From Swiss-Prot:
Its EC number is 2.7.1.92. The gene is iolC. This is 5-dehydro-2-deoxygluconokinase. It comes from Clostridium beijerinckii (strain ATCC 51743 / NCIMB 8052). It catalyses: 5-dehydro-2-deoxy-D-gluconate + ATP = 6-phospho-5-dehydro-2-deoxy-D-gluconate + ADP + H(+). GO terms for molecular function: 5-dehydro-2-deoxygluconokinase activity; ATP binding. NCBIfam families: myo_inos_iolC_N (TIGR04382).
Amino acid sequence: MEYIKFDKARKMDIVPIGRVAIDFNPIDINKPLSESSTFKKYLGGSPANIAVGLARLGKKIGFIGKVSKDQFGEFVVNYFDNEGIDTSQIKYSKNGENLGLTFTEIASPTESSILMYRQGIADLELNVDEIDEEYIKNTKAIVISGTALAKSPSREAALKALELAKRNNTVVIFDVDYRAYNWKNSDEIAIYYSIAGKQSDIIMGSREEFDLMEKLITREKNSDEETAKRWLDYGNKIVVIKHGKEGSTAYTSDGKSYNIKPFPVKLLKSFGGGDAYASAFLYGLLEGWSIIDSLEFGSASAAMLVASHSCSQDMPTVEAIRNFIKEEKEEYGDMVARA
């Protein structure tokens, strides 16, 4: 069954909106961040990583956001240009706002943490006047990042993009992408997440992120099935609830559910997999694949990313993911990731 109908006549496939940052990942891994002294610079931020992931998979991708007017901002735009991502809707900050900086800790393959500098940053200064309806009208889907809702004026810009997408029958994908930075309190999180979640067509988030979104809706913590039903009843066609190393489940508007497990892989780090998962899953949907095949592709891409040093730079191609799945199935069996 085709749950999402993408307008194939449109120029762009997907346009993420929101956070773009600079990641500094330690070269000297397997030690605390306080002891790391050498880092490698990468493009970062979930929406930006998803954009790169989809571009690597051969899709026509744009990006709506704001970057600093300095060398880091130039790095982002040049990186996107080199990946074939349209940068016509990337604006430069005018009041000295900086790009967010992220320093990662890879203490062990299973112990990773992230230190973000998110004050006075450019991406949260995107304003409503910088959202172009014609651009949204010419893309099959937009990805709204939850971090774009954390603070004004980015909050209103993201919600305007959502409203324009609905008006122009552009598919809305809500990637919850919770980061504690910049939010004032949990009530604020619940309010704005719910606004986006009630108007989207696809929601992707972890169990913990859905708990934050539902804080003001219910006093009790819901089961995955109860959560999925709630957001499907609001009009979503697909709700994906992730449980990290336990796998994830996609719930669909016809009452069905599809489970996928992680592929066995030797971990290097425990972050970055979610963006690769989202990119490859959305690629499958754009290709018209079944939900389970799209989930499998996403799980494979995620496994490849957590075994590599970066998030953006190591996003795989379609051929690489297919080869990975083939090798995994030859070693572990055809049902290696399928629950």
